[in-house]
Amino acid sequence: MSPQTETKASVGFKAGVKDYKLTYYTPDYETKDTDILAAFRVTPQPGVPPEEAGAAVAAESSTGTWTTVWTDGLTSLDRYKGRCYHIETVVGEENQYIAYVAYPLDLFEEGSVTNMFTSIVGNVFGFKALRALRLEDLRIPPSYSKTFQGPPHGIQVERDKLNKYGRPLLGCTIKPKLGLSAKNYGRAVYECLRGGLDFTKDDENVNSQPFMRWRDRFLFCAEAIYKAQAETGEIKGHYLNATAGTCEEMIKRAVCARELGVPIVMHDYLTGGFTANTSLAHYCRDNGLLLHIHRAMHAVIDRQKNHGMHFRVLAKALRMSGGDHIHAGTVVGKLEGEREMTLGFVDLLRDDFIEKDRSRGIFFTQDWVSMPGVIPVASGGIHVWHMPALTEIFGDDSVLQFGGGTLGHPWGNAPGAVANRVALEACVQARNEGRDLAREGNEIIREASKWSPELAAACEVWKEIKFEFDPVDKLDK
């Protein structure tokens, strides 16, 4: 044996495999204000102790690998490793635990959601020792969140740009989502905006297809916006979807929108990716564009209760990456969303400081310091009868978006927009007068419909429409 080999052996390196919990389970650890904290829902394989499972998550999402390596001795694992510092049993679930993991801040690149997720969820979810794994929540310390720009503008700046206060904003997704020519698409936009909506929207999969190329759509929508603004005296917008196959093409589309003078563009942030989204958010702040975010593909990641990632984590990541609006479910419409859980991540989007509240699914106190807020968008299977509940649930700082609930009106798009605007104004007035929207909502809509034939027709069409299915993802009891 050579002297060099003898020296390496003498420093204590021992090849082989050892339990993760010996290094990465540290129940005595006191978390630091600068740590990123994660709450994982862990379902170990039979025979795997929860401490070993939690430690494996901490190891595989930070410095660990499956065997001891001699290069561990070339750095300070104690400084850089993730630590599973607490484990609790999930009441009512067999062999399921919440494992809390603390990550040192130096593990992450500044201002990069991409790097943060690559570390925390990039590899560990396929680990064989775990039957299932879900990231329930993250605590982002101010020392990390301050390295992000965040939303291009935020709630107050958007209201100032639009000169609209004291009520939710109204939107509409143009339908059919695919197949319209650019000119007919622009016509639908114009009818909705002149009827009283604040915004219309490209659907998430409207990019640049053979039936309607993006530049043609942008031009006809800009024409519709200017015409509706001239007729109504209100500032209008259409979410022009800039999502594209490359970042360069995406920015080119945003540049065109800016040159047309429109107020807002749109991005599909999960399918487009966080790097592209952050790049677009920076461009939007630099060039005065609002940024609407669609969460297409989110349910692939967040719908199952025991595996994946909860939407509250995706919402926090979006606030850091940048967006002025994001779709957040409706509670009352056709898409998944339990009320208390939805309100929990709505507050995480809008508020500066959110206290830990397990009854709403919030595992950690979150302090965003001065990062601007994001407006939640309620969209999916909603109509005029839902207006009181939506106004009561989401409050003023929200966008209520009616696609079929506008374009499905028996008299056309503009009357559909009128019906929604009248219903909203009636609900806001009733609320301001002290009436209980939750209890008196239907009566408020009926009273308003006496003075609006458009609303009366909408009420008749959708009086029997309900989406009453039990949510898949519920809060733990």
Curated annotation (Swiss-Prot):
Name of a matching Pfam family: RuBisCO_large
Lyase keyword on record: yes
Catalyzed chemical reaction(s): 2 (2R)-3-phosphoglycerate + 2 H(+) = D-ribulose 1,5-bisphosphate + CO2 + H2O; D-ribulose 1,5-bisphosphate + O2 = 2-phosphoglycolate + (2R)-3-phosphoglycerate + 2 H(+)
Record PTM text: The disulfide bond which can form in the large chain dimeric partners within the hexadecamer appears to be associated with oxidative stress and protein turnover.
UniProt KW keywords: Acetylation, Calvin cycle, Carbon dioxide fixation, Chloroplast, Disulfide bond, Lyase, Magnesium, Metal-binding, Methylation, Monooxygenase, Oxidoreductase, Photorespiration, Photosynthesis, Plastid
Entry EC number(s): 4.1.1.39
CDD domains in the cross-refs: RuBisCO_large_I
Cofactor annotation remark: Binds 1 Mg(2+) ion per subunit.
Entry-annotated residues carrying N-acetylproline: 3
Location in or out of the cell: Plastid, Chloroplast
A GO term for molecular function: monooxygenase activity
Additional information: The basic functional RuBisCO is composed of a large chain homodimer in a 'head-to-tail' conformation. In form I RuBisCO this homodimer is arranged in a barrel-like tetramer with the small subunits forming a tetrameric 'cap' on each end of the 'barrel'.
Functional note: RuBisCO catalyzes two reactions: the carboxylation of D-ribulose 1,5-bisphosphate, the primary event in carbon dioxide fixation, as well as the oxidative fragmentation of the pentose substrate in the photorespiration process. Both reactions occur simultaneously and in competition at the same active site.
Record note on quaternary structure: Heterohexadecamer of 8 large chains and 8 small chains; disulfide-linked. The disulfide link is formed within the large subunit homodimers.
Stated name of the protein: Ribulose bisphosphate carboxylase large chain
Lineage: Eukaryota, Viridiplantae, Streptophyta, Embryophyta, Tracheophyta
Gene, per the UniProt record: rbcL
